[in-house]
Each structure stands twice: as structure tokens, then as C-alpha cells.
Design a protein with these regions (language model features):
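Bacterial N-terminal signal peptides that target proteins for export
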Residues: 2-13
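Contiguous, structured surface segment used for ligand recognition
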Residues: 29-178
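Substrate-binding groove of N-acetylhexosamine-processing glycoside hydrolases
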Residues: 35, 41-44, 49-51, 59, ...
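Beta-rich nucleic-acid/ligand-interaction surfaces
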Residues: 98, 102, 220-229, 373-377
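Sec/Tat signal peptide C-region and signal peptidase I cleavage site
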Residues: 24-28
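Bacterial N-terminal signal peptides
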Residues: 11-22
Length: 782
């Protein structure tokens, strides 16, 4: 995924440079004129002129279609749909009613202001004007696309108040600063239902997002790569249906396929082992093997045939760590790199071969123009591609001179956020120490991801150094986040790409809360803050250790390990086991975990507040109830972790009680304390299983089941040899509690029962039969 290792360092450096040279937007930036009147619009329009008064909008108003507009146009359909669905309002069919909403298309109706980068004509196609008076609302688009966007703004503007709907008198003229606004939807490790994906496309259009890049990996029924197809996978007809649905709403559905790296989902299969760059690594294709291109071209054909009407294709050339290095019996890249002059030119050759095939099929290819290419390698690239990222002042002017346009790439969530994005950050004092790097590294202080994205997009030197086409907002699901958690970042990040000089990010966040959840929302910002902070503590509340739970890691971005190295997992300090003859404990578990336990108590109280807010908003908000149900399931996962920590503390207390009773020769009481400790352990298991089942039920309302076999197909359960994505560790939803399953509480329980029974026998007390079955995740048992 993007923004890792060298890429992440580069982005961080460039942002720091930006902040120094240009100055970040202050948190106290002036509120927009619309927000000051209680109106929420996202993205914020370019030009707003408001009168002094608001006026009422009712179902007595009627619709009038002007030049260039037909009754079946999507702008007309969308206006009717959204008025009915969001506001329970149907416009009058009587043309004699007092108010009129007039829709029209007129070329050059809106003249763009300062265009700082990009294709002015393409930007003008998306422009619209909105004139608002007490008896007439007129939306005029330069094209049908602009008209559609004007409709979305009108619907967003309608403000419920005291049982009525209001609009501000005035005029809006609006257009985008960047032509293409892509969000990345990650279905690599799960598959959303088709209706969920359709709704995602429609939601995207509401925020003027005009492209969704969908990563499916094995969740598509490839004709030319049948072994990789997973138990649940979109059919070609379904992908075409999804494509057509997006185009209806002026949203491009962009296929996303990795290569040469990040292809363990292909190369793990024995049928494709001969295509590996290194025989013992499934991470990367051999770029000199003709069969690599034959396979990729077949997969391209399958995707293109099911994506007719699409314009773009994301050829994800992400993190090709080892390209040009291999020299073994099945791959001779090193020789070719030497012939070409560098591994960067070797990479450029792979990009050119694959992209030219797609270009010949009529697609504009978005790729990642990055390491190991250097500026003097870029002249080997054709100019018909789009670089999906900016790469800094050393590279961007070279891409520009080469005629290669670029996207401003950033992420609403990366590879270190578990269960929920870092929209808000914990204060420094609330963090627990952790590793200095890697996925379990504690969160660094900062303004939160929305402001980080806003600063990067609005203040990037690429506005001067590159020929910008658009933005790319990624929502990575490497660690298994649900895409529903990413909408705040998708909408606010893309809003800055539409209007670079948008008001401050906090204002955009508040506008999103109003628009996404509708009227009746209570302290939504606080709910997101608590979700973010609880997610950070969920990750940091466990320690990190080397693991044998999966095969070792073959290499990293800058090295091939001579001997593969263990990956990492999370754990907690082990519970002490009583020893004979007096149930002696070797150490004080509470002391080892003092700060962890203190903070768990505080976060449990905050979890109470979070659950109250989610339940309140489930009762009161009008829209996105499933989103809130999902947040409830995540909040319960947070809570289960907190309660487990505190229950382990209670177990520790019972062990101490047993030791104390044994020291006073109170055998009956000592055994009873041990029995209570074992009962607490069983309670942790039961609660964990109940929360997992509830989360699974909720997530499967929008996902197909993660299973080993279905529809005559089997999932090949093998991990990536270089990357360690948490959902790949399990076939099912148990990745949500994976670290708990690895925690050796079963071993502790077995040894504690043995110690208990040995002590009981010595004091003529009954033995106890007990099996914790810690790894069992089925129905809870008494």
C-alpha cells in the first residue's frame, strides 16, 4: 500500500516543508458564510454571495425543465430521489404553484475563476450556478455533469428547522480545482454486497467524488485466472452492472490490479509459482518472464470486458522492492537491469509493457511512479499515463516535462490504524509505549488525519511543480477496517480537491456530520473522537513480540533476509501460575500492568459515554443507521478488550487471595479463590465470543461471509511472504480477536487447574474438572 517506508518518509518530509514555507491553515480559520447561517455544504463552493434573509422551501414548489434537460436525466432523477429519501418531500406537479425549481444546461453559463493547474475546459464541464430567491431556484450547469453537481448542492443546502425547510437567498458559482477526485475502496480481504457497492458509488457522487477505484484481488471471477477466484466473487455481469450504475451518477468505477508486487493473492497458488521473481517468495512477479505479461493481459481483458464505459485503470505498481535484482533459475531480471542501465529502467520497462497494453484498449493508466525509478529513468515512460502520486520537487517537474500528469495522493486510513481511523488523536500523555516502527507503533502526535489530508492537498508544492489531474484518497484495509469507517476522510479529503481554499478542516468535518447523518445528530464529533481514541488505546494496550503463528517474513523494502525473520503479534504479560506447596506466585501481574490497568479503567468510563452516544444517535438520526450499527459493534470490541484487561486484574486478585489463604492454612478458601479465577477466565472467553458473534452478524449485513469454501470454490489459506495483513491470518472474522486467541490463557488455565487439584488433594478436598477451551469461538457455554 502507499505511504509506507520510503514513500511515507517522503510525504512526511514534504508536508513538514509545506508547513514551514507556506504555513498550515490555522484551526481557528474563519467560518464559511454558509456555515455561519447554519447551512452545510460539502465540498464548500468556490463563490458564495448571500442575501440577508432565508426563505421557506415546501412541497408546493414545482419543477421546471429548461434547455438541455430531459425528464429522465440523472440530475432530475437525483433531485427527486434525494428530496424524497432525505427530506420526505415531493415537488408539486402543479405548474401554478408559488415556487419553481428550474434546471438548465447552458454552455459557458459559469466562467471559472483562477485555475491554478489542470485542464480548464474539463474543469468547466463540472461547473454550475445556483440562484436562490424566495420564488425561484435556478440551477444551471455548463454540462449535464455540472447540473448534477448543482442538484447535490441544492439538496445539501436545504436546512430543516422547526419542522420546515429553509434556503438562503443568494447565488453560488462553483467548479472544481481538480478534475478527477478518486477514492480507493479496498475489497482485497472481504467482498461487499453488490447493493452496498452501488450505494457507495451514489454516496460518492453526493460529495462530488467522481471516481471509485475498486480493489478486488480474488473477489472477481477471472476467466483467465480461475485458480485465484475466491468463494465469493463478483461475476463479470455484476461488475458491469456496478460500472453502469456509477456512470449513471457521473462516477467512474476504476479497476485496480497490482503488479509486479503485492501479488501474493496470485503467486501463492501453485499454478503460478513459476512466475515468481524468487521461488521462495510469493510477493513479486518476475518482470522478465513472458508468461507474467500473458497472465496480466488475460486478467486485464477480463476486467475491461466487465467495465465497459470506463476510462481509467489503476495499474498498482506499488512497492516493487526487488525488481531488477533476481538472478536465479526461473528469473533473470538482474541481467536485464544491467542491459538497461538501472533497476529503475527495468521497472519502467515493466510499467511500459503493461500500461501500453491497457492504453491500446483505450484506457488511461494510473500507476505509481516511484522507487526504484530515479529522475533520469523517467524518460523511459510513455506520456499517456498518469502518475497516481506526487513525488517531490526532484521528480515532479520531470514528470511534468515528460507530459505525465499526476494525482495528489493521500490516505484517510493507513496500515497502522486498527478498527477505526485516526480522525482525532489521543493526548501525548494517554499513549502507552510501543515499538519504534511497524504496524504496532504508537500513534504520533498530530492534528488528525482530516487536517493532515487537507494541508497536504491544499499546500503541496506540486501545484507549482506538477501538471495535476486530480486527487486520490485511499482507504486501506490492510488490517481489516470496515470501509464504512472511512467516509469522513473520503468526503473531506475530496472536498479540498474540489476547492483548494476550503474553510478549515474542522468545519468540513462538522458539515459532513450534518449531511451524512442528517438532522437529529447529537455530539457526532465527540462520537468520532471517542471512536478514534478508543481505537488507538485498543492497539496500544497490548505489547508486541516475535511470533511463530505464521511463516517468517522473507524480506523488507530494502533487504532480502538471509534467513526469513519472525513477524510480530501482540500479547500481554502472562498470568502467574500458583506453585506447590503454598500456591506461591512468582511475580505480581498487577505491578507489571499498572499503567495499562489504570488507563483501561479510564477508557472504560469513556466507552460508556461512547455507547450512550451511539444509541442516542441510532434513535435520533435520520440516515446511515447501518453505519451507526457498525460503530456499535466496533465500540463493543473496544469494550471487550477493556473488560478483559480488568478481568485479568480480577483474576490476579483471586490468585493473590489464594496465595494468602494458603499461607494461613485456609485450604477451602484458597481453593475457592482459584475456582473463582478460573470462572473469571471462562467469563472472558464467553464475553469475547458473544462480542465476536455480534460483530460478525453486523459486518455480514454488508459483507459476504469470509469462508474457506462456497460456490464450488475454495480459498487457499496461505499468507503473503513479505506483507503481514491481519485479515490474511484467518479465513473468517476471528482476525478481530486474533491476538486474544494467541494469548496463552488456555495454558495458564491447564497449569492452574493442575496446581489447584494438587493442592486440593494434599488437603483432602475435591478435584475439579475444567477445560477453558480458549481457542473455541462458538456459542458461549456456562
Amino acid at each position: 500500500m502507499r505511504l509506507k517506508t520510503f514513500t511515507f518518509v517522503r510525504w512526511t518530509f514534504s508536508l513538514g516543508t509545506i508547513l514551514v514555507l507556506l504555513g498550515a491553515h490555522a484551526d481557528a480559520a474563519a467560518i464559511s458564510s454558509l456555515a455561519s447561517r447554519g447551512y452545510a455544504v460539502l465540498p464548500s463552493p468556490q463563490k458564495v454571495t448571500l442575501g440577508t434573509n432565508d426563505f421557506e422551501f415546501t412541497n408546493a414548489w414545482h419543477l421546471e425543465l429548461g434547455q438541455g434537460v430531459k425528464p429522465d436525466d440523472i440530475a432530475v432523477q437525483s433531485l427527486k430521489e434525494r428530496l424524497q429519501q432525505r427530506l420526505n418531500l415531493t415537488l408539486s406537479k402543479s405548474t401554478g404553484s408559488a415556487g419553481v425549481v428550474r434546471l438548465a444546461v447552458a454552455g459557458n453559463a459559469v466562467t471559472l475563476g483562477d485555475v491554478r493547474n489542470g485542464n480548464k475546459a474539463a474543469l468547466a464541464d463540472q461547473a454550475y450556478s445556483l440562484q436562490l430567491t424566495p420564488d425561484r431556484v435556478t440551477i444551471t450547469g455548463n454540462t449535464p455533469i455540472g447540473l448534477f453537481y448543482g442538484v447535490q448542492t441544492l439538496v445539501q443546502l436545504l436546512k430543516p428547522e422547526s419542522g420546515k425547510l429553509f434556503l438562503p437567498a443568494g447565488e453560488i458559482q462553483d467548479w472544481p480545482d481538480l478534475e478527477l477526485r478518486v477514492i480507493y475502496w479496498d475489497d482485497a480481504h472481504h467482498l461487499d454486497h453488490l447493493d452496498v457497492l452501488k450505494e457507495a458509488l451514489r454516496n460518492a457522487s453526493f460529495y462530488k467524488i467522481n471516481a471509485v477505484s475498486l480493489k478486488l484481488e480474488g473477489h472477481f471471477q477471472y476467466e483467465h485466472a480461475k485458480p485465484i477466484v475466491e468463494p465469493y466473487a463478483l461475476s463479470p455481469a455484476e461488475l458491469q452492472e456496478l460500472t453502469d450504475y456509477g456512470l449513471k451518477y457521473h462516477v467512474q468505477l476504476i479497476p485496480y490490479l497490482d503488479g509486479p508486487a503485492h501479488v501474493a493473492f496470485i503467486l501463492k497458488h501453485p499454478e503460478y509459482a513459476a512466475l515468481r521473481e524468487y521461488p521462495d517468495s510469493n510477493y513479486e512477479f518476475c518482470s522478465t518472464n513472458p508468461d507474467t505479461y500473458k497472465l496480466l493481459q488475460g486478467m486485464f481483458d477480463d476486467l475491461l470486458a466487465a467495465n465497459k464505459g470506463g476510462k481509467y485503470f489503476v495499474l498498482s505498481t506499488d512497492e516493487p522492492y526487488y525488481v531488477g535484482l533476481a538472478n536465479n533459475d526461473q528469473c533473470h531480471e538482474a541481467d536485464r537491469a544491467k542491459q538497461l542501465g538501472s533497476v529503475g529502467k527495468m521497472f519502467a520497462e515493466f510499467v511500459t509493457k503493461t500500461a501500453s497494453y491497457l492504453h491500446d484498449q483505450g484506457r488511461t493508466v494510473i500507476f505509481w511512479g516511484e522507487y526504484p525509478m530515479k529522475p533520469n529513468d523517467l524518460n523511459a515512460l510513455p506520456n499517456y499515463m498518469v502518475n497516481g502520486e506526487v513525488y517531490g520537487p526532484e521528480y515532479d517537474p520531470v514528470f511534468k516535462a515528460q507530459g505525465i500528469r499526476q494525482l495528489l495522493f493521500t490516505s484517510t486510513v493507513g496500515w497502522k490504524e486498527y478498527l477505526f481511523p485516526n480522525y482525532y488523536l489521543l493526548p501525548e500523555a494517554e499513549h502507552l509505549p510501543g515499538p519504534a516502527e511497524g504496524t504496532y507503533e504508537p500513534v504520533h502526535q498530530g492534528p488528525g488525519v482530516v487536517k493532515e489530508m487537507s494541508d497536504f492537498i491544499s499546500q503541496s508544492p506540486a501545484w507549482q511543480n506538477a501538471n495535476l489531474l486530480g486527487s486520490f484518497i485511499a482507504g486501506w484495509a490492510d488490517v481489516g477496517l470496515h470501509p464504512e469507517t472511512m467516509w469522513l476522510g473520503y468526503a473531506t479529503g475530496s472536498a479540498v480537491a474540489w476547492h483548494r481554499d476550503s474553510p478549515d478542516p474542522r468545519g468540513a468535518m462538522n458539515a459532513f456530520y450534518k449531511l451524512f447523518y442528517g438532522p437529529g445528530g447529537t455530539n457526532i464529533g465527540r462520537m468520532y473522537q471517542l471512536m478514534s481514541e478508543q481505537g488507538q488505546f485498543w492497539k496500544e494496550s497490548w505489547e508486541v513480540k516475535a511470533t511463530s503463528a505464521r511463516t517468517p517474513i522473507w524480506g523488507d523494502w530494502n533487504i532480502i533476509y538471509e534467513t526469513p525473520r519472525p513477524s510480530e503479534d501482540q500479547t500481554l504479560p502472562l498470568m502467574p501460575v500458583p506453585s506447590s506447596p503454598l500456591l506461591t506466585l512468582g511475580y505480581d501481574w498487577d505491578v507489571q500492568n499498572s499503567r495499562r490497568l489504570t488507563m483501561a479503567g479510564r477508557f472504560l468510563a469513556q466507552n460508556d459515554e461512547l455507547l450512550d452516544l451511539i444509541h442516542t444517535n441510532l434513535e435520533q438520526t435520520k440516515f446511515e443507521r447501518y453505519n451507526l450499527e457498525l460503530y456499535l459493534s466496533i465500540a463493543q470490541l473496544f469494550r471487550q478488550n477493556l473488560q478483559m484487561l480488568l478481568d485479568l486484574q480480577h483474576i490476579s486478585a483471586e490468585l493473590k487471595q489464594a496465595e494468602a489463604h494458603a499461607g494461613r492454612a485456609e485450604a477451602t478458601e484458597a481453593v475457592a479463590a482459584l475456582d473463582r479465577a478460573l470462572t473469571l477466565a471462562a467469563g472472558i472467553r464467553n464475553q469475547r465470543n458473544e462480542v465476536l458473534q455480534a460483530a460478525t452478524d453486523t459486518w455480514y449485513k454488508s459483507w459476504f461471509p469470509r469462508v474457506a469454501e462456497a460456490n464450488g470454490r475454495r480459498f487457499l489459506d496461505k499468507v503473503d511472504d513479505v506483507k503481514d495483513h491481519l485479515p490474511v491470518r484467518t479465513v473468517d472474522m476471528t482476525y478481530l480477536i486474533y491476538r486474544e486467541l494467541l494469548y496463552p490463557l488456555d495454558d495458564w488455565a491447564t497449569k492452574t487447574v493442575a496446581a489447584r487439584n494438587e493442592y486440593a488433594a494434599a488437603h483432602h478436598l475435591a478435584a475439579k474438572s475444567f477445560s477453558l477451551d480458549w481457542g473455541t469461538t462458538g456459542s458461549s457455554r456456562d
